[in-house]
Amino acid sequence: MKHKLIALLITGACAAVAEATAQPVTKVTFYSPSVVRIVKYPADMKTQPEKHSFTVIMKPEKVKVKTTDTGNATEYETEDMRVKVDKATGTALFLTIKGDTLLREMGEPQFTMRKGDVDEGKYIVEQSWKLDKGEAIFGLGQRKDKDISLRGKDITLWNVNTYTTIPVFTSQKGYGVFWDNMGRSFFTDNDKGTTFKSEVAEMTDYYFVYRDGTTDGVIAGLRALTGRATMFPLWAMGHWQCRERYKTSDELAGVLDKYRELEIPLDGIVQDWQYWGCDSNWNAMRFMNPYYINKVGDPAYERYLPADMRNMKQSEPRLKSPEEMVKYVHSRNSHLMISIWASFGPWTEPYAELKKIGALLPFETWPRNSGTLPYDAFNPKARDIYWKHLSNLYKMGFDAWWTDSSEPDHFEKPGDDDYMTAAGSWRSVKNAFALVHNRGIYEHQRSTKGNSKRSIQMTRSGQLGIQHYGTFSWSGDISSTWDVMQEQVPTGLSYVICGIPFWNTDIGGFFSWSYHNNPKDPGMQELQTRWMQWGAFMPLMRNHCSSPMVSEIYEYGNPGDWAYDVQKAYVKLRYRMLPYIYSTQGDVVLNDGSMMRPLVMDFAADSTALTRNDEYMFGRSMLVKPVTSPLYTWQDNNGYGHLIYPDIRQAAAPVEVYLPAGTAWYDFWTNERIDGGRKLMRPCPITEMPVYVRAGSIMPWGPEVQYSSEKPWDDLEIRVYPGADGKFVLYEDRGDGYEYERGQYTLTEFRWNDATRTLTIGARKGKYPKMLTHRRFNIVMVGKDSGRGDGAMKVTRTVEYNGKEITMKF
């Protein structure tokens, strides 16, 4: 039946309207021309329920909306989209400006009253939509699935270790839906429709995003809503070494020394857990393990010894305090990340302070049987206490935070969902825990007087919005198997397409039980080598493993051994790509770009590309196909690996690669030019992972270095891949600090006109202190005689550049 329009702002430049149906009230709010919020609540509520969004920080803009009464519906039109609301049912239909259907709601939302728990009086809610038959949709975050498609899937949205769900799906049609509910939720796609369902809410609440029909447009809208990405320091784009765990400062320093001795580039090293001591002292955020503070044998500190260190022997330590360790790492031109958790043992000072204000969550977490409890990150006073203790490590000079177990770990039992946080029941807020936890650390660090470091946090969980708070996710404690590696590629793609640009895995996996924790096992060596190759093309490159495994490159062999040489070569390759990688990060921050791009982002019209779960674009130029199956080893029934070929370096088994249509491609290694729209079997020796460069690409390559800031970028190699027009913007700043937020950076645009074979280097835009004002560019017109992609290529022309525009023909 028809009903009256009950809410406001329906003419001219408007933001919100609300309509009442026989059942729910439908409220339409435009946050921008490309982002609209749809809220529905039962008609017996007099007003819209109040709600705090953990994720959305954007306020509605003043949007010009044209409102039209079409008889049975009211239509709202912005410059980017049209939304039509049925007057009888309140169902919404989303269309392009031309009138093409993007998405339609199916019927009214469902509201089922909760009874018998702390959320009694609220609702279980669900909303369904009708998609086109065969329409591809992606997203929902990090989930262990070898298929990036969401069609036909049933997925629970409840964050645990290795499983970080984001309530976002995007379509090949270039729209996205963000279901703004951080409680236990469910996604279902079947013949009846595509549905989100949440266990606790007072209304359905989602955002529809559509700008220009591209996934880039969707991601820009999501970041406008939840926060633009922040810039990580240059060093973070380099190579990180991590292991569970370095048990003394000297052991950590010795690993760094070995990397420098072997000339394996390195920018970051990680101190894992138990520097605080035993489990009862869990996450004290103080160095109380006597091995780190030269207190071995001191009765006052012996109580803090972890069980696995009680019989360790140590000679007089070289580094006698954590302060000395930090200074030493910095003196060797590296940086130090340290593990911190979202829980505290009963012996710690934070535990006592949090208990006093009622800010500990009373459920069982890890480590079990230790009395350790998570803190209530939803309580702002608890976040203050957390930083109060973490700030001591910050003052020591630590560069980055590893916020482990940020789901947090939870050994669930009946009734746990009824625990109340400062923001509501656990079942209603849990999926936002990592977001508020990391946000608290970021905001406290940013507010610290004299802060000159960019905040960088690596978190095991995540949520839409963490990109705004100096945080990236890793995929959790995964196993070292080929099967797991295969699923990690689509796992990462499903995460980043939700709008969070920075992600990585433990290179080599974490638990190496399947190969008996043996880095000399040929099967483990092949797996580690292939994973390291892939790691060179992740947004961040970090080696890791669990004890008793070791992850250092030199543990896999000596110089001259293939497992050592190939890993080192790819680390060196990563460093030569740093100008490309850092500029791509600049595109992420300034233009809402993405570093790791599922093929739908660039080839949405290519149906074959949409189905590829094992390839992606690294930046806008490079197509990457990780090798995720063993080619040269086999594993026996006892878990031991064996070589198939006596000399693995002589083998070249084929790997299938698909090159998307609509462009030509260059084999990165050989420079062979190949037309797109075809599958091919690429010979794949252990030294090579399939990488292709899109025709029209312009890529800056840097010098060989041992750490990211060792040499200035005053002599860059600029590779041009002919075959299409193209451009690239070189982004530069001082490499750390937040001056870039005030415009202190430079942009240098390179443009290639393929028809005229003309390269233009535009006038430099911007400035920052101590920037290069004069430099040399070595132009490489890539072709079959240019040399291998991983080497120094044959220079076609060298130009001197002082910031003024240069044009040259080839």
How should each PLM-predicted stretch be described?
Residues 1, 19-235, 242-244, 249-251, ...:
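N-terminal accessory segment at the very beginning of proteins
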